[in-house]
Structure formats: C-alpha cells, structure tokens
C-alpha cells in the first residue's frame, strides 16, 4: 500500500501498520505542513528499499516466479516548476533498476486534454516534458478499468475540474512478465483522489484481452 500526502511526522507511520495489519513499512515524513509518503507491505514480501525522497520511493523485490522486480512509487511535485526535478530523479533510478520495472503513483501531470474534464478551456502545461521522460525511459502506459478521472477539486461551479493524475507505467519486460495484470481506479470518496487497486498475478482472467501497447512517441501532440 502506497500513501501520499500523509502529513505525518517521523515514526508516526507505525500506527498505519497496526491498523492495516502490515508486517513492515517505510515512510518519508512530512516537510512543514505538507508532504509525507508511506509504503506498507504484507508478510509474504521481502522488500528492499533502495532509494527514498519526498517524491519517490524505489524498491526491489522478487515476483511470484522469483524474478527480480523493481517498483518506483511516485508523487509528482504539485509545483510545475519543480516537477522536472522528479523526472530527473526518476531517470537516475532507472540506471540502477531491473529491466522488469513498474512505476505507479500520483504523477501530478496530465498527458493530454483527454485526461481532464472541466467547463473552461485551459492549456495543458508540462505534458511534453513528461512525454519525453516516458519515451527516454521506454515506459508504456498500463490500461486501467474503473473511473476515468482520479482527482477532482472541491468547486461546485464552472471551476469544477476532474483529472487523471494517478496512473501506472511499466517496461516491456514487466508487461511480458505480468500478462494478466489488473489495475482499477476506484471512485473518489473520502479524499480528492481515488485509489488504484492492483493485482499483478491474476491466474484465471475472465477473458483473454490483448494488451494495448501505448508507447509514447516524440511526435505525439497535446
């Protein structure tokens, strides 16, 4: 389980472990009045934390077949001017990750106008830099069922906005190793974000569906 914006002080994540029955966890405390990350896992997983910061937790573990697996849990910076720093950090992590690599979290970044619903036309800033990062890292977007948008603001007038900020990307090697993966975007209920529920090892899919590979090219337009 990966939580963002926990706003917890150091060592306060222990309470989350107890409430959710996790064996172990790792946290990044808040800075000032915002931020904070928490990652918890079940007893059957041996997770090795390799890198942690206020925007990214990188871990290594073995999948159910015993193959090495890398996962990066992302919290994109809310400030557009500082978001590039997160992409640079992600690139540095790629240099030490296994080819079997998954990236998941709140990237705080749209890729196109299709990721946004609102009553006012607005420019999608930062999309090109994000696309180029995904292209250089050779990451493919993973299909998710459920809700199209994963975040909404609190306005009830024509300033109301819904966006798709939470998503998952993976290397081709990860996709080939987990052909029956499932991601589902949950409804937005008690927070301004909806959670992503994932299952990497579905053994008996209800139907065989082809994977829609969405490699992001340099020529993609916003």
Please describe what each predicted stretch is.
Residues 1-222:
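A shared catalytic/ligand-binding motif for oxyanion handling
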């Amino acid at each position: 389980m990966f939580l963002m914006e926990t706003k917890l002080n150091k060592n306060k994540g222990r309470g989350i472990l107890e409430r959710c029955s996790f064996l172990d966890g790792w946290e990044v405390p808040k800075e000032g009045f915002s931020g904070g990350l928490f990652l918890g896992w079940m007893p059957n997983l041996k997770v090795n934390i390799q890198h942690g910061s206020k925007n990214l937790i990188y871990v290594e573990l073995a999948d159910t077949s015993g193959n090495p697996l890398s996962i990066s849990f992302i919290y994109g910076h809310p400030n557009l001017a500082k978001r590039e720093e997160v992409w640079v950090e992600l690139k540095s992590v790629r240099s030490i990750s296994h080819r079997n690599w998954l990236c998941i979290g709140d990237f705080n970044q749209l890729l196109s106008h299709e990721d946004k619903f609102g009553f006012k036309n607005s420019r999608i800033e930062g999309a090109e830099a994000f696309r180029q990062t995904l292209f250089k890292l050779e990451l493919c977007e993973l299909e998710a069922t459920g809700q199209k948008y994963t975040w909404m603001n609190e306005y009830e007038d024509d300033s109301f906005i819904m966006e798709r900020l939470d998503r998952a990307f993976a290397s081709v090697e990860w996709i080939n190793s987990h052909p029956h993966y499932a991601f589902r975007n949950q409804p937005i209920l008690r927070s301004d974000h909806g959670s992503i529920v994932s299952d990497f090892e579905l053994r008996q899919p209800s139907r065989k569906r082809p994977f829609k590979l969405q490699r992001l090219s340099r020529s993609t337009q916003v």
